[in-house]
Amino acid sequence: MTEDRFEDLGAERRAEIGDQLAERDRTHPEVRRPEVPRPGNKYAWAVGIVAIMGLSVLLFAETLPNKGKGLFGLKPGRVIPAFAAPNALGNAEGDPNICQRASRCNKTIGTVPACSIVAPEVVNSCQLRRKPLVLTFIFDRGADCYPQVDRTERVRPSVPGVTFATVFFTNKKRDQARAIVRDRGWRQPVALDDKGITDLYGVGVCPTTVFARAGGRVVTTRLGNLTEDQIRHLAHRIER
């Protein structure tokens, strides 16, 4: 038989004690011990950040003009390829000519070699590479690349022996592109590109800056923004 510890008490007394205990349970509930936290992965936050960064790179990559394996520009030692393209401030129309030699010319890349197209309203890389050259590539989407050209403009007067030029890959109307160049005060030649030059040079990062010695041989290709001091230092380097 189960022992009742209140069996010696009367019914009323047992009821009274029961009520008192119930009231005590209500006013003094048992303190619950906090749950022990489950062991977590201390690197989980890092995995999350990497995943977000990967998504950002993927989204940015979708805006790049050049998605092939040549994403980082020309390697040192290469001679910059020939192109002839409309100057943003001129009235020349048409797509850039990127034909490297007569035997390979066609309607897609140009019916004559690019080097043969020389005119005041045309930006011709064969003319540019006669002197040390700083050639900047910018896009009008994906990132704000325009300030890089602003910086090259401020550096340009301090290295008069170096030519500065820009390739502007844009889908804007001609008047819009011309307005950008004028409003920002760019005095260096700005070649308008429809993607052909950018792909030819293997550019997929905005901005990309190519530094080449006289004759067009590349010394270095730099990805991303550069300070004025960096631009000036590299410009002096290609003079030697």
Please give the residue ranges for each predicted region.
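Thiol/disulfide oxidoreductase modules built on the thioredoxin-like
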Residues: R130, A179-R187, L192-E239
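A short beta-strand-turn-helix
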Residues: A84-L133
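Ser/Thr/Pro/Gly-rich low-complexity linker/stalk segments immediately outside membranes or between
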Residues: P34-V36, E62-V79
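Structural microenvironment flanking redox-active thiols in thiol-disulfide oxidoreductases
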Residues: K131-R184, G196-D199
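Hydrophobic membrane-insertion alpha-helices, especially the h-region
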Residues: A44-E62
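Short, Lys/Arg-rich cytosolic juxtamembrane segment immediately N-terminal
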Residues: V31-A44
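N-terminal intrinsically disordered, acidic low-complexity segments at the extreme N-terminus
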Residues: M1-R32
